Amino acid sequence: MYCPRYKHFVRLNTNGTFGVCGHMVNPPQFNNINDAQSWSLSLSDRPAECVRCWELEDIEQPSIRQAAIDRHRILSQIKTDYLIVGGVLDSYCNSACMTCSATLSTKIAKLEGNVFVMDNYEKFQELPHDRIVELDVNGGEPTFSKNYKHLLDNLPANVKVVRINTNGSRYFEKVEELLQRKIKVIVTLSLDGTGNVHDFIRWPIRWVDYTKTVEKYIELRTKYKNLSLDFWTTLNRLNLANFESIKEYAQACAIPHQYGLLKRPAVLDINNTNEEELEQFVEQQMKLRGITWQQ
């Protein structure tokens, strides 16, 4: 399985290590960037780590691998040894999503009585900044992170593209600043449900606020040709029945939409048919957040 991503993408992991690709299942982890860049992908047609991509390709849906091949044709012209940096800058977040955990959200950590904060800002400084042409690091929630704002104010000189993955809870003023600097900006809005399904999965972010944020980005897109928008859905047992509504909303917004299949927590995998386990999970999560399910 050919994929340029593992040689040109470095992920900042939640445990302070470096990873490759950022979309793998059970990916290798490395303590330094040199080891990460020396790792080689299996020659198998279907490496086990790449299951999320080849499962989508099997049903003729676009995969991260295919997108990476298209991107490689462009980015390799900018710099042959280009590097895309992704992963987790920190865990500062204003949302306690049902599919998330305390390691990626300070909101969840606080609900659990945990003071844990994951911060990879210094780890980012270890990277070869002269090779970085695209920044794809997230959180947490970028609009909620002082680290992320500082990073955007001090971008490495060769960065031409910034992708921001946001929960859509608020409009990010930094986007227009980047656009004015002629940097290509891709805003990926997580779209894990519409209406009450959104409000349950993305608690405490409200659907009414999310749609207002989307409208602001659509308006901004009319002003800047270097702004691209897309939706990303993490498909799981909580939003599977809502998927048609999700697709209809994306189509109405004229925003490209992609999705991936959730693997963790396993109880939310759409291939998991254990209803009792799902019910227990949902009850536990509702109790933690003090909410009820109103589908």
Label every PLM stretch briefly.
Residues 81-92, 103-119, 130-145, 157-172, ...:
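Core AdoMet radical
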Residues 1-69, 263-295:
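Accessory C-terminal segments flanking Radical SAM cores
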Residues 152, 175-176, 211-218, 243-248:
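Generic structural signal for well-ordered alpha-helices
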Residues 237-253:
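Catalytic cores of alpha/beta
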Residues 49, 57, 92-96, 101-104:
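Short pre-active-site segment immediately N-terminal to redox-active cysteine/selenocysteine motifs
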Residues 127-131, 213-229, 253, 288-292:
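A structural motif corresponding to the C-terminal end of an alpha-helix
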Residues 177-184, 218-222, 251:
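Acidic (Asp/Glu)-rich catalytic clusters
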Residues 52, 60-83, 93-95, 114-117:
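Recognition helices and adjacent regulatory flanks at domain boundaries
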